[in-house]
Structure formats: C-alpha cells, structure tokens
Amino acid sequence: MKKYLSILSAVAVAAAMVACEKDGNDDANKVDVNDPSTVQTEHLVAYFPLESEAKAVELGKDITFSKKGGSAAFVEGVRGKAYANSAADCKVFSYLDFKLGANNPFKTMSSFTMSAWVKSPVPNDGSPAMLSINAGDGGMGSLLVMYEGWGCNTDSLYVKSYLFNTRTEWKGQDLGLSNVAFTTDKWFHLVYSYNEATSMMTLYSNGQFVAESGRWAGPEVNGKQEGLGKLILDPAMSNLYIGAWWNNLDGTHADAWRSSYPGSVDEIRFWDIALTPEEIEDLYTKEVTKADKL
C-alpha cells in the first residue's frame, strides 16, 4: 500500500511540474495585446524598427538592409532607436538603403497602409523625401512620402504622399497638404493609406483623420469616370530608401530641389490593406503605450 501511495505521489508531483512548465511556456508565448504589430497581423507585410544596421528591418519578405549613407545615424527614438539625419540639414546627404528582391511585398499590394513616427524641423532647402521606392515614374518613383518645402510653416509641415499605378491611364497620384496636425520639431504618428475599394488616398496624424482624396484611373468617358481601383506598383522596383530621393542616389534625376530628409523616423510599418479609421486609432494607442519617449 505504501509503495502504491508513493507511486501516486510521484505521478502527482510529475503532473504538477508539467503543468507548471506548461503554464510558464504559455506565459512566454502570450501575445502582447499592446504591441502595434497585433493590428491586422495577418496583413502586416513589413516592419522597420530602425534600431541599428543589424536591426533596421525585422519583417518583410525579400527586404534586406544594404547600407547607411552620409550623415545617417541611429539615435534615441520613440521606441528604442530611430533613424536620423544627424546634421538636421536638407543639404547634407543622409539615407538608409534597403534592397527589394523579386518577391518583396510592395509588388503585390493592391491596397496598403504605411505608418511611421516622424519628427522634423521645417526643411531648410528644397523638398525632402522621408521614404521613397524606385522605378515607376522617372521623377517620383513607385511610392513616396515627402515634404514640400515651399508649403511648410513654422508650426506645420506640408506632407505629400505619392503612388504610381502601372495599370491605369493616369498613373501618378498624390495627396498633400500643410496642416497643424503635422507638427514641426515634435514626434507625430503619420499614417498614409490607399483603399482600392474606394479609390481613396488618406492621411492621418496621431490616430486622427486629416485628409483624403478620391483618385481616378483616367478621364471621364461618356459621363462616367472610373476610380483608380486596384493598385499595381512597378515590378521593376529594387530599392527602398529612408531619408532620400531614390533618383538622387542612382543619378537619374539628381535635381537640386530633391533634398535630404532633415529629421528622424521610427517604427515604420506596412500593411497590404487599407486599415479602417478604428484600426488606425487603435494602432496609435498601442504605439503610444509602447513608446519610450514622446
């Protein structure tokens, strides 16, 4: 009987140990509900934490960090480190270069959302590019987020978003404006989206809607005008740059007004869908929760 009880006790102890170990693993594997990457995770296709050269990109099929150029540096950001033009000068070359392979996710995005923390002074020269993807239009590229230097004010930046749809007659599309929601010298969370179902380009700041514009595939024909619809970016794309115009770096359109981004960028994410206003607000809440410094 004692032997039988001893066996039962040993079994009970072993079971308890397994249960504890399992509980511990469950805790370790629990999803952090406050992580911004939990917003539409299945559609999150690229994530650039911009912590260092080794951890500039964390998620993104066929996206690899290539090099840091000019006055590019990794400095204190909203969450950990961030990319910055250490000279804070549009006239000083500064960029990060990422190579885009044949299977990169930007080639197949028919809709998209891009989010990033940005902080910049008023541009002191030209119109700087915060993010650019090459190919597409020879001047503007496939996808672009820039500031129009002439449209910025002391308290607000002129943010301009651009895309190039290869499948439509009217290919180059943009949405840009100056707004106090795009603050100077202060971090704000910028979201740029395109929705193929509505043909709308939209800009948000700190989780709130700022502006939108319906885009068209071509001119009106017989009283009807087709929306831009499904997006197909140029499959010839090969590079994504943070902080500089792609054509300044490859020399194809090295115009003087295409200046370097003078500020900082952190936590860039791309989804292959247009997030809803509610999801964008939720994303901002999670971003703030995870922020080290704002």
Q: Language model features by range: what are they?
A:
Residues 162-189:
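Short, aromatic/His-centered strand-loop micro-motif at the edge of beta-sheets
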Residues 4-6, 17-91, 236, 281-294:
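Extracytoplasmic low-complexity segments
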Residues 185-194, 203:
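Short tryptophan-centered beta-strand motifs in secreted/extracellular beta-sheet-rich domains
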Residues 43, 100-122, 131, 139-149, ...:
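A carbohydrate-recognition surface predominantly in extracellular/luminal proteins
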Residues 131-165, 223:
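Glycan-recognition/cleft segments
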Residues 214-263:
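Flexible glycan-contacting loops in extracellular carbohydrate-active proteins
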Residues 29-39, 89-112, 174-180:
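Short surface loop/edge beta-strand patches of beta-sandwich-type extracellular domains
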Residues 46-53, 113-122, 237, 256-287:
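Extracellular, beta-strand-rich glycan-interacting domains
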